[in-house]
Amino acid sequence: MANQMLGAMVNEHYGSEGLLDRILTVARETGIEIDEARSDDFSAVSEFHIGGRKATIDLGNMAQLSAGDKVLDVGSGLGGPARTLVEKFAVLVEGIDLTHEFCLVANELTRITGFSDRAVFSQGNALSLTGDSEHYDVVWTQQSCMNIEDKRRMLSEAYRVLKPGGTFIFQEVFAGDREGAIRLPVPWARKSEMSFLWPAEAIRNSILEAGFIENIWKNVTTQYLEEYRVTAEKTRDSMQSSTLGVHLLLGNEAKLMRKNVVDNLSKGLISVYQGVFKK
């Protein structure tokens, strides 16, 4: 599929006019003082990956991030993980995302929570990074590769912009051990044309072929499955009670999408891995 066509599909899937207003309206209704908001006040909507904010912190610890590290967050979404990394590890983050609306919301939530001097977001493409070669200490991605068809090119770009000795760290959804079509819709795709899930070992080999050295390769499917099952149930409750949640960006299908993720994980059709690799 042509990159331009896929990009349009991704923007249509995730993009939602008025998203910022919806988030702030619901935040106020739930008692959040916007002028005093903290990063974790928005985590239910801005860290909607499997494992949520806890998984972000786990990854940061796994990567042994250091204060002042320059981090490129590929597929930065609403900026939740970036703000968590800034808050917990004192790093500097540049986030890129294919979805224009996400970047607008990410920058505003970052301003509101007081991290604008340490995290900034712009529209960009993982297949053609604008950063200089050997510029970043860390390239970070959490569940953005499912929408990327040309994964080898993405890995090549990640390798290019990393400094020698830099760290590539990820949490991603891969194909599971059981063959078969996944149940749709899921949070990253309403149609099969948007979902590109490779087997874990194929990804692992491609990372090594790109030049990276493996430090950690970890199947965390079981670790996060039950937790995500609870999260999926809470999605229904948050939709009914007008609290912050992924339904604000994915709409009325959010509950079904998360239920399908649980089903796909339980049946072995998809898996979740974390990895740390060095350049």
Model-derived features: where do they sit?
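A short glycine-rich, Lys/Arg-flanked "PGG" loop and its adjoining helix->strand segment in the class I
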Residues: 152-167
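Class I SAM-dependent methyltransferase SAM/SAH-binding core
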Residues: 70-74, 78-128
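Conserved Class I S-adenosyl-L-methionine
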Residues: 216-279
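Conserved alpha-helix/loop element of class I SAM-dependent methyltransferases that forms part
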Residues: 49-67
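Short alpha-helix
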Residues: 195-211
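A short acidic, Gly/Pro-enriched loop at the edge of an enzyme's catalytic core
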Residues: 127-138
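N-terminal auxiliary segments of SAM/dcSAM-dependent transferases
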Residues: 1-28
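Short, glycine-/aromatic-enriched active-site segment of Class I SAM-dependent methyltransferases
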Residues: 173-194
